[in-house]
């Protein structure tokens, strides 16, 4: 089967033998994989059985559907990725997935985002990863595993030495498991990227940020860290910055959708004057205002030559701050990507960024604005570009190759790409 893959035929036989009706979505994807196997299977193939795919018949994958599929893929060593996002897998399906992960020695990428997996399902999947030595990238985004489910993944991180990317964003985790995960990462040497976006926090003391900061002081393997929607304030940013003076590995820091003001950005500006590791900084949807933008522009113009991408989308910045950042780009040639939409553009801002684009200093693919002229006045229109435009969805009509739009510039690509 690994030499001459015929996934669809095996799926038909498996459905007939178990009495399970064929799922049209699975059948369509397997037929397409069989058709393309000559050029693709030797490098490994990712089966994209996403329940939000509008170009093929969509009957979302159930627990019973996946049980049959798992039996088909048991010996398919050329299948190295499995995308099951936006289906209806529950804890029962997670049990089948755990068995599959224990027996499978080929899968490197698994996307389970936005299914219906809960705490017991998280326990089973995390338990399977205690022994799995193949999987590199796991996305659990949007499954409501809760604080207890997150604790099982924290325990897994103490045992697993293979997993490189773990996405636990929007999983309703609480402060206890965030602290446990941060503690586990003080010893885990394999995780390169972790997403902890949107936990459920009930305290204003920012204990979780303090523990993440302590972890960053000792962790030398983490490259990408997402702390969006953490209700983080200036105190939390100060703690992170103190840790990052001693950290030389983190290259992508996501602090979007927090409560950071210009005073917090001042700490980041001072950090950028000395830090020689950060390449991507996401400050979208904070309230950094002109003063914060000026702090950043001073650091970028005079000191920092490492940062390559900056997002300040919807950060309540006006013309003075935006013009200052455009001026920094004229002297800092390393900063190649900047995203500014959602701020308050005046004519000076429009002129400044139009000039950067026309002179070739800022490439159209590296920003989210495009200049146009009406009655002799320059304006800026929005472009669909950004650091994580395709975090929750992937366009069905095209293959998105740009790392700038999908994730990090810096982290090494794994099986998802």
Specify the residue positions occupied by each region the protein language model found.
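Leucine-rich tandem repeat or coiled-coil scaffolds
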Residues: 1-417
């Amino acid at each position: 089967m690994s030499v001459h893959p015929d996934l669809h035929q095996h799926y038909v036989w498996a459905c007939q033998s178990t009495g399970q009706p064929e799922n049209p979505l699975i059948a369509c994807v397997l037929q397409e994989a069989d058709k393309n196997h000559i050029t693709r299977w030797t490098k490994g193939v990712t089966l994209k059985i996403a329940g939000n795919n509008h170009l093929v018949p969509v009957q979302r994958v159930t627990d019973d559907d996946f049980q049959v599929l798992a039996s088909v893929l048991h010996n398919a060593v050329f299948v190295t990725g499995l995308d099951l996002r936006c289906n209806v897998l529950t804890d029962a399906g997670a049990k089948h997935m755990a068995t599959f992960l224990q027996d499978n020695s080929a899968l490197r990428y698994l996307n389970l985002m936005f299914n219906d997996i809960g705490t017991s399902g998280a326990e089973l999947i995390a338990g399977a990863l205690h022994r799995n030595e193949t999987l590199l990238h796991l996305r659990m985004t949007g499954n409501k595993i809760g604080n207890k489910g997150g604790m099982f993944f924290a325990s897994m991180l103490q045992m697993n030495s293979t997993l490189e990317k773990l996405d636990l964003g929007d999983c309703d985790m609480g402060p206890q498991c965030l602290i446990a995960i941060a503690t586990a990462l003080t010893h885990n040497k394999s995780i390169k990227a972790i997403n902890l976006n949107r936990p459920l926090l009930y305290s204003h003391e920012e204990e979780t940020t303090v523990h993440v900061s302590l972890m960053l002081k000792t962790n030398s393997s983490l490259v990408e860290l997402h702390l969006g929607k953490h209700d983080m304030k200036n105190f939390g940013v100060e703690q992170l910055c103190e840790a990052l003076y001693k950290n030389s590995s983190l290259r992508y820091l996501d602090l979007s959708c927090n409560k950071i003001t210009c005073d917090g950005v001042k700490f980041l500006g001072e950090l950028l004057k000395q830090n020689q590791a950060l390449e991507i900084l996401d400050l979208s949807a904070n309230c950094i205002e002109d003063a914060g933008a000026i702090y950043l522009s001073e650091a970028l113009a005079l000191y920092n030559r490492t940062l390559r991408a900056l997002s300040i989308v919807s950060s309540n910045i006006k013309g003075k701050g935006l013009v200052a950042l455009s001026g920094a780009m004229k002297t800092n040639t390393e900063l190649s990507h900047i995203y500014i939409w959602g701020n308050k553009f005046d004519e000076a801002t429009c002129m400044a960024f139009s000039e950067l684009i026309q002179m070739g200093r800022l490439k159209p693919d590296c920003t989210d604005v495009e200049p146009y002229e009406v009655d002799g006045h320059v304006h800026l229109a929005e472009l669909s570009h950004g650091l994580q435009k395709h975090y929750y969805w992937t366009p069905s009509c095209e293959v998105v190759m740009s790392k700038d739009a999908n994730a990090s510039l810096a982290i090494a690509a794994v099986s998802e790409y």
